[in-house]
C-alpha cells in the first residue's frame, strides 16, 4: 500500500467517531490515539498521543450539530498536526456545514460558506475531502484542492438492488427547482422518469401553491435531495406528489440527515414510506423515526483516502 514511504494516520473528533472507526477498519489501520475534549468554559482542546511527524494525516470530522464545536475541533486538530510536523494534512469533512450560506440573499448578508472554507487553509490543511456540497461551486471557495465525493452512486446501487426491473416504471422527483440537476443525473442512472415540485405564490399574502411538473400519476416515486434539515420541504413535496399528482407511493433519500427540530415528527406523520440517508452525520440523529434507513459511506471514503494516500486518481469514485 505504501508508495511514498510516509505513514498514514487517521484521527477523529467527536462529530462522527463511528464513521471514522468503520473507515479505519476497511483500510486496515487503527484509529489514531487522540483526545478531543472541552474545557469547563467550552473551549476545545486536542491532545495527540502518537507521533505524526512526516505522516500523511487524515482528520475526520463532519461539521454537524453542535456545528461550531465540531468546526473548532477540526481546526484545532489540523493546527495540532501541522505544529507536530505532519507531512500532509487532509481534512475529511463528510458533511460540510454552512454550505447553504453561499451567497448574499439580501443586503449586508455575509457569505459564511466562503469564510468557513478559508478556515481549514488558515489552520494548515493541505486538502479537503467532503461529500455532496450543497452547491458544487463551493469547491471554488477553498484555496486548496477539494475532492467532493457524490452520494449519487451509493443511492443508485441501493435502489437498483431494492427495486430491480421495477425502476423503469418509477419516477425521481426533485422537491424544488434548485435540485433538478442532481435529480436528473440520479434518474438517468436508474432509467427512471423525472418530475419536479414547483412551489410558488400567485399573489402576495396567499398560501404557497404546489405544482407537480411531470407525470407521477399511479407511479412509485423517489424524492431526491442533498439534505433533510427540518423536513418541511420534503414532507410538503411528498404530500403534493400524492394529493396533486396522484402518485401511488413516495420514498425519499438525501445525502445528509441534519434532522433539526420537528424533522422526525414530520417524517413520522408524512406519506413517505422510507427515508434513505447516508451516515455523513451520526445515525443517532435519526433515532425515533422507524422510516429512516442509513446507508454507510465508509467504503467510498475509505477508498478515496487510500487513493489520495497513494497519489492515485479518485475519478472512478464519481461513476
At which residue positions do the language-model features occur?
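PRPP-associated nucleotide enzymes
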Residues: 1-319
Amino acid at each position: 500500500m505504501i508508495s511514498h514511504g510516509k505513514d498514514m494516520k487517521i484521527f477523529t473528533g467527536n462529530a462522527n467517531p463511528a464513521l471514522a472507526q468503520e473507515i479505519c477498519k476497511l483500510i486496515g489501520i487503527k484509529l489514531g490515539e487522540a483526545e478531543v475534549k472541552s474545557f469547563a468554559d467550552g473551549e476545545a482542546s486536542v491532545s495527540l498521543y502518537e507521533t505524526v511527524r512526516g505522516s500523511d494525516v487524515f482528520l475526520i470530522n463532519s461539521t454537524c450539530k453542535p456545528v461550531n464545536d465540531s468546526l473548532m475541533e477540526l481546526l484545532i486538530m489540523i493546527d495540532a498536526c501541522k505544529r507536530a510536523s505532519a507531512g500532509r494534512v487532509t481534512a475529511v469533512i463528510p458533511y460540510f456545514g454552512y454550505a447553504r450560506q453561499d451567497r448574499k440573499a439580501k443586503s449586508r448578508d455575509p457569505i459564511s460558506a466562503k469564510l468557513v472554507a478559508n478556515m481549514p487553509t488558515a489552520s494548515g490543511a493541505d486538502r479537503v475531502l467532503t461529500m455532496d456540497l450543497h452547491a458544487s461551486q463551493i469547491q471554488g471557495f477553498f484555496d486548496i484542492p477539494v475532492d467532493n465525493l457524490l452520494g449519487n452512486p451509493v443511492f443508485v446501487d441501493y435502489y437498483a438492488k431494492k427495486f430491480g426491473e421495477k425502476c423503469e416504471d418509477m419516477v425521481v422527483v426533485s422537491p424544488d427547482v434548485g435540485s433538478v440537476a442532481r435529480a436528473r443525473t440520479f434518474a438517468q442512472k436508474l432509467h427512471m422518469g423525472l418530475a419536479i415540485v414547483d412551489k410558488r405564490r400567485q399573489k402576495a399574502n396567499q398560501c404557497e401553491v404546489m405544482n407537480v411538473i411531470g407525470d407521477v400519476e399511479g407511479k412509485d416515486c423517489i424524492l431526491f435531495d442533498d439534505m433533510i434539515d427540518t423536513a418541511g420541504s420534503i414532507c410538503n413535496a411528498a404530500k403534493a406528489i400524492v394529493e396533486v399528482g396522484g402518485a401511488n407511493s413516495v420514498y425519499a433519500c438525501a445525502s445528509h440527515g441534519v434532522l433539526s427540530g420537528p424533522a422526525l415528527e414530520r417524517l413520522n406523520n408524512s406519506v413517505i414510506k422510507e427515508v434513505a440517508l447516508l451516515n455523513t452525520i451520526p445515525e443517532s440523529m435519526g433515532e425515533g423515526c422507524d422510516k429512516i434507513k442509513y446507508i454507510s459511506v465508509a467504503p467510498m471514503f475509505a477508498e478515496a483516502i487510500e487513493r489520495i494516500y497513494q497519489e492515485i486518481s479518485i475519478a472512478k469514485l464519481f461513476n
